[in-house]
């Protein structure tokens, strides 16, 4: 049998005139892209366009089938389209998407993991190049002691600054409905039926860490009805927000609901006199970041990232398994993260080898995981998995949130990857604190929000809100300047 690492066309391992390799989707065979006859290459995004030149980057290749199969050789590529003097990818380009994403992947350079192992040489679509490094780092930092019961977690919430696995998730308040399946677990098929096959989802290609535009029907066919060895690529859905989906009864943990800063301050202006004659923003929807469904196939990998605004995260595994590798937001780790984010060759560096004080946690079906603000983390999926999770800002982590937002600006994170309406949330918080509204709230379980806000946090909030680029029109103060003055008066 021929060595699959030898090009089937030129019979060479190394060909100076053909540096880009591609692996067959259906077998281990590798070939040089430039050895494939042009007549066997087709564009995925153009229906009637003759291919006159070879792809010049592994990122342009969508799929490949080698001559060993009866269907014949066939390479599918993305066409690069020139428009108004600029080279642009077609409409499948994830840069065209304007839906808020949870994770602030950098705009500096699209990650090209496809050709990482050998520059632009070989392209294995079923194994992420960082998988081995991730597993080594996971074993190094493996942690079995960060566990806590739900009652203690809720009671100690303000003082918690490390990730915890909740040992009694059934007592946490998190709720995922049982459905009419064999084991009663929520499934991708059920979610598709509830939301609709035509509903848009952003699907991440694990190798390139880039998003593609799919509908739920196509995703369900890929996830539910395609055997793992028949999948053309490893893919991941991590940004399906479902808080507004009727009939999908999901409930967040009690500790999350009690400490979600947006929930506390978003609508309070409606109960106070408006000195500007403005109406409260009753019809202004809250940021939708509270309930996500995450669907990942075996070997899916999400590279190191910060959730937008460094939000805290709750993470309930419905089915499958997850491996988390997390690093705290120490100044040293943050500095290294910024440096890595700004590197042109960041895809060649496994950040976990550089960061310090790691925590590695393995999650199984039924587990509930709580991540505090600012943790830099990567996630690996050993088996097909379905997860219910979400993000939330807290008064506990206000300084961290503000710090991460500045890092997002420094590293030029696209707006759609940032926390929606963050400046508006901060403005409302300023009014809430300045007016000390929490003292007259009817919900005594809220506690005294102002007393939970440190002087340092108020100083950081004041420094943020007075920036000219932060736009907010107060409802209870004549101007942002007067609001800032009232906030400054709180600092003792």
From Swiss-Prot:
Q: What is its EC number?
A: 1.14.11.27
Kindly list the positions annotated as binding substrate: 302, 322
Tell me where in or outside the cell this protein is found: Nucleus
- Please state the protein's primary subcellular location: nucleus
**Iron: is it a keyword of this entry?**
yes
Which residues participate in Fe cation binding? Answer: 305, 307, 377
Query: InterPro entries recorded for this chain?
Result: JHDM1_Histone_Demethylase (IPR050690), JmjC_dom (IPR003347), Znf_FYVE_PHD (IPR011011), Znf_PHD (IPR001965), Znf_RING/FYVE/PHD (IPR013083)
Q: Which cofactor does it need?
A: Fe(2+)
Which residue numbers delimit the PHD-type Zn fingers? 4-72
The observed outcome of changing residue 305 to A is: Abolishes histone demethylase activity
GO cellular component terms, A-Z = nucleus
Q: Which GO terms describe its biological process?
A: chromatin remodeling; positive regulation of transcription elongation by RNA polymerase II; regulation of transcription by RNA polymerase II
Catalytic activity reads:
N(6),N(6)-dimethyl-L-lysyl(36)-[histone H3] + 2 2-oxoglutarate + 2 O2 = L-lysyl(36)-[histone H3] + 2 formaldehyde + 2 succinate + 2 CO2
Q: Which UniProt keywords apply?
A: Chromatin regulator, Dioxygenase, Iron, Metal-binding, Nucleus, Oxidoreductase, Transcription, Transcription regulation, Zinc, Zinc-finger
Cofactor binding annotation: Binds 1 Fe(2+) ion per subunit.
Domain JmjC stretches: 254-409
Family per record: Belongs to the JHDM1 histone demethylase family.
Notes on the domains: The JmjC domain mediates the demethylation activity.
Q: Any remaining note in the record?
A: Present with 784 molecules/cell in log phase SD medium.
**Which protein, by its recorded name, is this?**
JmjC domain-containing histone demethylation protein 1
Q: Which organism is this protein's natural source?
A: Saccharomyces cerevisiae (strain ATCC 204508 / S288c)
Organism taxonomic ancestry: Eukaryota, Fungi, Dikarya, Ascomycota, Saccharomycotina
């Amino acid at each position: 049998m021929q060595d699959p690492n030898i090009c089937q066309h030129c019979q060479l391992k190394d060909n100076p005139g053909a540096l880009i390799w591609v692996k067959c989707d259906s077998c281990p065979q590798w070939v040089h892209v430039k050895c494939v006859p042009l007549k066997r290459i087709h564009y995925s995004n153009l229906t009637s366009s003759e291919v006159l030149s070879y792809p010049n980057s592994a990122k342009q290749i969508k799929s490949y089938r080698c001559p060993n199969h009866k269907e014949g050789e066939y390479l599918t590529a993305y066409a690069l389209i020139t428009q108004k003097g600029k080279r642009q990818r077609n409409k499948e380009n994830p840069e065209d998407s304007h839906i808020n994403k949870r994770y602030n992947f950098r705009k500096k350079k699209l990650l090209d993991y496809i050709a990482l192992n050998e520059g632009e040489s070989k392209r294995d679509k079923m194994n992420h190049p960082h998988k081995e490094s991730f597993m080594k780092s996971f074993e190094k930092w493996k942690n079995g002691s960060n566990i806590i019961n739900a009652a203690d977690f809720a009671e100690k919430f303000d003082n918690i600054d490390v990730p915890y696995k909740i040992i009694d998730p059934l007592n946490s308040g998190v709720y995922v409905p049982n459905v009419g399946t064999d084991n009663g677990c929520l499934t991708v098929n059920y979610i598709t039926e509830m939301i609709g096959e035509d509903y848009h989802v952003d699907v991440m290609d694990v190798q390139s860490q880039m998003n593609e535009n799919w509908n739920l029907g196509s995703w369900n066919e890929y996830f539910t009805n395609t055997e793992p060895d028949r999948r053309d690529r490893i893919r991941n859905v991590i940004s399906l927000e479902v808080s507004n989906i009727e009939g999908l009864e999901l409930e967040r943990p009690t500790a999350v609901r009690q400490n979600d800063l947006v929930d506390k301050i978003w609508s309070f202006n409606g109960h106070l006199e408006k000195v500007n004659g403005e109406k409260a923003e009753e019809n202004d929807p809250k940021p939708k970041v509270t309930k996500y469904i995450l669907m990942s196939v075996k070997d899916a990998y999400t590279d190191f990232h910060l959730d937008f605004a460094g939000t805290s995260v709750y993470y309930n595994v419905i089915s499958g398994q997850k491996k988390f590798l997390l690093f705290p937001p120490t100044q040293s780790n943050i500095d290294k993260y910024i440096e890595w984010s700004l590197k042109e060759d960041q895809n060649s560096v496994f950040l976990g080898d550089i960061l310090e004080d790691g925590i590695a946690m393995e999650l199984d079906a039924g587990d509930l995981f709580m991540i505090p603000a600012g943790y830099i983390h990567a996630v690996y999926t050993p088996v097909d998995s379905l997860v219910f999770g979400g993000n939330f800002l807290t008064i506990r982590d206000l300084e961290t949130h503000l710090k991460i937002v500045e890092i997002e600006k420094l590293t030029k994170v696209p707006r759609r990857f940032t926390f929606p309406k963050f400046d508006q949330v901060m403005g409302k918080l300023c009014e809430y604190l300045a007016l000390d509204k929490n003292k007259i709230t009817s919900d005594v379980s809220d506690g005294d929000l102002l007393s939970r806000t440190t002087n340092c946090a108020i100083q950081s909030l004041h420094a943020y809100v007075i920036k000219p680029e932060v736009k907010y029109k107060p409802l209870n103060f004549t101007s942002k300047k007067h609001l800032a003055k009232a906030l400054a008066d709180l600092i003792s």
